Amino acid sequence: MKINIRDSTMVRPATETPITNLWNSNVDLVIPRFHTPSVYFYRPTGASNFFDPQVMKEALSKALVPFYPMAGRLKRDDDGRIEIDCNGAGVLFVVADTPSVIDDFGDFAPTLNLRQLIPEVDHSAGIHSFPLLVLQVTFFKCGGASLGVGMQHHAADGFSGLHFINTWSDMARGLDLTIPPFIDRTLLRARDPPQPAFHHVEYQPAPSMKIPLDPSKSGPENTTVSIFKLTRDQLVALKAKSKEDGNTVSYSSYEMLAGHVWRSVGKARGLPNDQETKLYIATDGRSRLRPQLPPGYFGNVIFTATPLAVAGDLLSKPTWYAAGQIHDFLVRMDDNYLRSALDYLEMQPDLSALVRGAHTYKCPNLGITSWVRLPIYDADFGWGRPIFMGPGGIPYEGLSFVLPSPTNDGSLSVAIALQSEHMKLFEKFLFEI
């Protein structure tokens, strides 16, 4: 796909903002170190000012005033801990066009083509050199447009990131800020002294393959990214399987879907019966902490539920067995457990050793992040809601996302990166409901 860059600007806050250093909590520091990629697609409206860059940039500049850390840079404090230097240096805003059309993207699988709609970040000059937010509006030959977003994960998780993007889109429509961001991460400070009360398996090393994989088939060049849509009827049928074999515990649709994906991936990978597999479920702590965090808390509140099973149990038992493992872990994630996790992290000599990455999710393990409850379709800049929003790439084999339907038809989509030889089998098993 050919992309022609028309303009590239650093957009700064519209008025003076606090010059300060923002302390990062332990959960800000153990999430993957990359710019989370996402892409929005918009159909043409016929408006003469459709996605006018000037309108977009002025609103962006206004939104950066309350959300001033987004215009900062990363730096290390005297102890080497990463924090945010709120210096108002700005965010990158790129305008581009392409002879391609939106329909060229088909089902919007987060492939390398989609990644071209987001500005590349050069990390080579050190952590203080790059913006925390990079944005690109791309105009298509069909008249439509996309908004590509790369957001440094230390700055925000999905919930906070969307709070910013949706505030920006509101301001582009002339609306005022509704929920101010709460910019103080010390609410997630560990206790002094730390008092971890649980064995935090989520921060223990992931199981590795007992029989090593063929390196010629397991490298990044042999990883495929696909997206699969499950209809409302298929999801209802899947949830009904929680009652198989006389099981009396009711599991949620999400627990059943996550369990089904975990099993299907295990089958597709052909895991031996005695192979351990760990599932990493991103879990938002906002509603689980007591007292609850302020609604505009700006940062990362992502904890991880990590059920562990042997493949033989996972594959030979009904889907509700996998869902049950997931359910039991999610139920545990209350205030006591999350505070214990913060304390456990505080006691680690080097948090960088716990940063998630390719080594975490690769075969035999799996990561699932749900965007189902996130307001991913609310970014209306004045020209309508997006027809699609999803990840702009999946950086690691074994990482997956569950996405809601843009049309509220009750369907869900699973975007996933797997070894190419496993993907076809995964598709087959996923639709065997």
UniProtKB/Swiss-Prot annotation:
Gene3D superfamilies: Chloramphenicol acetyltransferase-like domain (3.30.559.10). GO terms for biological process: cell wall organization; lignin biosynthetic process; positive regulation of flavonoid biosynthetic process. GO terms for molecular function: quinate O-hydroxycinnamoyltransferase activity; shikimate O-hydroxycinnamoyltransferase activity. InterPro entries: CAT-like_dom_sf (IPR023213), Plant_Fungal_Acyltransferase (IPR050317). It catalyses: shikimate + 4-coumaroyl-CoA = trans-4-coumaroylshikimate + CoA. 4-coumaroyl-CoA binds at residues 252-255, 284-290, 370-373. The keyword Acyltransferase applies. Keywords: Acyltransferase, Cell wall biogenesis/degradation, Transferase. The active site is at 153 (proton acceptor), 380 (proton acceptor). Its EC number is 2.3.1.133. GO terms for cellular component: cytoplasm; membrane. Acyltransferase involved in the biosynthesis of lignin. Accepts caffeoyl-CoA and p-coumaroyl-CoA as substrates and transfers the acyl group on both shikimate and quinate acceptors. Belongs to the plant acyltransferase family. This is Shikimate O-hydroxycinnamoyltransferase. It comes from Arabidopsis thaliana. The lineage of its organism: Eukaryota, Viridiplantae, Streptophyta, Embryophyta, Tracheophyta. The gene is HST.
